[in-house]
Amino acid sequence: MFMGEYQHTIDAKGRMIVPAKFREGLGEQFVLTRGLDQCLFGYPMHEWKQIEEKLKALPLTKKDARAFTRFFFSGATECELDKQGRVNIASSLLNYAKLEKECVVIGVSNRIELWSKVIWEQYTEEQEDSFAEIAENMIGFDI
């Protein structure tokens, strides 16, 4: 399980050191893809395979299903960590998430997310005020 928030930097070659606490969970190979809310999602291979099966089961006759799977899979890249624990992020993914030098890596249960520091700060500021309301509106959820 992934959890926590870490501040990191991306070098001029598009490489980022993956937080040590996330490396074992991601494994030697993992997938980075376009996520929601202008961030990147990172999945261990076993999680990616489960998502792949669910998305393959969506009906091709549904326009939204086709659009989502195209967007999700076309942005996906298999990644490996180098000996220093860095991942090389594809330029198309860097552009999508507006990732520059400063970034935030967060753990979200079965995945990690990579955010532009600026976008993450804006997002958390917007969500902090409505966190209790969001929790209240989630059906069948209690903490």
Swiss-Prot record:
SpoVT-AbrB domain residues: 5-47, 76-119
InterPro entries xrefs: MraZ, MraZ_C, MraZ_dom, MraZ_N, MraZ_sf, SpoVT-AbrB_dom, SpoVT-AbrB_sf
Family: Belongs to the MraZ family.
Keyword terms of this UniProt record: Cytoplasm, DNA-binding, Repeat, Transcription, Transcription regulation
Location relative to the cell: Cytoplasm, Nucleoid
Matches recorded under Pfam families: MraZ
Oligomer and partners: Forms oligomers.
Organism name: Bacillus subtilis (strain 168)
GO cellular component: cytoplasm; nucleoid
CDD domains in the record: MraZ_C, MraZ_N
Deleted gene: phenotype: No visible phenotype.
Protein name as it appears in the record: Transcriptional regulator MraZ
Induction conditions: Transcribed at a constant level in all growth phases. Part of the mraZ-rsmH-ftsL-pbpB operon.
Domain of life of the source: Bacteria
GO molecular function: DNA-binding transcription factor activity; transcription cis-regulatory region binding
Gene Ontology biological process terms in this record: negative regulation of DNA-templated transcription initiation
PANTHER family, alphabetized: TRANSCRIPTIONAL REGULATOR MRAZ
